[in-house]
Amino acid sequence: MQNKIKVVFCGTPKIGADVLKALIEMNQVEIVLVISQPDKPIGRKKQIVHTPVKKLALENNLKVVQPNKIGEIYDDLAKLEFDFLITCAFGQFIPTKILKLAKIDSINFHGSLLPKLRGGAPIQYAIKNGDKKTGITIMQMVKQMDAGDYYVQESIDILDSDDSGSLFEKMGHLAYSMCKKYLVDIYNHKFELIKQNEDEVTFCKNISSEEEKINWNNTSLDIFNLIRSLSPSPISYTTINNQRYKIKSSKVIDLDNQNKNAIPGTILGINKQGIVVKTLDKALLILEIQKEGKKMILASNYYLNKLSDLKINDKFD
């Protein structure tokens, strides 16, 4: 290939940086511009931290811009010549007039097996739904969210041991390898686009703060999946006596007969493994817990260190 593939890349978190890393490593690619969300204050000290995409771009001497809305830089983009606009977890709506600036196509690395899980939180929802598989779809971007035809998709297994953190990591590796494997073939028009089956479309909006609260009237499996989907951030929570407790990890366990009629949310046991709580159908063993204002600890500390703020027969709201 004589001419380099010219790319404008849009992305923000680590999974976006994984795709950018692949592009940087490809000799066939020239990255014309990197676009990322504005830097935000992080943590208790509210320090301004570069997005992972911006950090990687600066380390590789790439030009980076961070508009509040990408439409603000339309005139600048229109002056550039580029073959692809490539996005992965950018986090902004991109107007159609910008999508049309790419000579060949505007494509997105979407974190699900489309048409399932269109929307902003596909990786979290795959876990929340209890799915056993998910994957990456390289798709055309169109005005309607995640509705474009796609070039290719690859799947990976979701293990019971996965949470959002580990699944994001695995999906990042998959997106990285797919970028290297397929971009040149897409450039050379070696793919036939595949239409999404509209009868199989599902959606996933961003998980709201209200949905982060555990409902103990749900099944153990549903609560287990919710906890995994929100770990390591923002972390699901429960309350008792107006006190909030975050729960980072858990395990589904069976009930003994004497506790089958207990009210969901009741603490049934505190032992060397953790804290046992009644759910709709079984019990949940809490493995990691954080009282508001304190550090995250192993729930077994309640037994080993005789912590007294949670007791057997207490009931979470």
Swiss-Prot record:
Gene3D superfamilies: 3.40.50.12230. It is an enzyme of class 2 (transferase). Signal peptide: none annotated. It comes from the Bacteria. PROSITE patterns: GART. It catalyses: L-methionyl-tRNA(fMet) + (6R)-10-formyltetrahydrofolate = N-formyl-L-methionyl-tRNA(fMet) + (6S)-5,6,7,8-tetrahydrofolate + H(+). Its EC number is 2.1.2.9. One of its GO terms (molecular function) is methionyl-tRNA formyltransferase activity. This is Methionyl-tRNA formyltransferase. It comes from Mycoplasma mycoides subsp. mycoides SC (strain CCUG 32753 / NCTC 10114 / PG1). Keywords: Protein biosynthesis, Transferase. HAMAP family: Formyl_trans. InterPro entries: Fmt, Formyl_trans_C, Formyl_transf_N, Formyl_transf_N_sf, Formyl_transferase-like_C_sf, GART_AS, Met-tRNA-FMT_C, Met-tRNA-FMT_N. The gene is fmt. Attaches a formyl group to the free amino group of methionyl-tRNA(fMet). The formyl group appears to play a dual role in the initiator identity of N-formylmethionyl-tRNA by promoting its recognition by IF2 and preventing the misappropriation of this tRNA by the elongation apparatus. GO terms for cellular component: cytosol. (6S)-5,6,7,8-tetrahydrofolate binds at S112, L113, L114, P115. Belongs to the Fmt family.
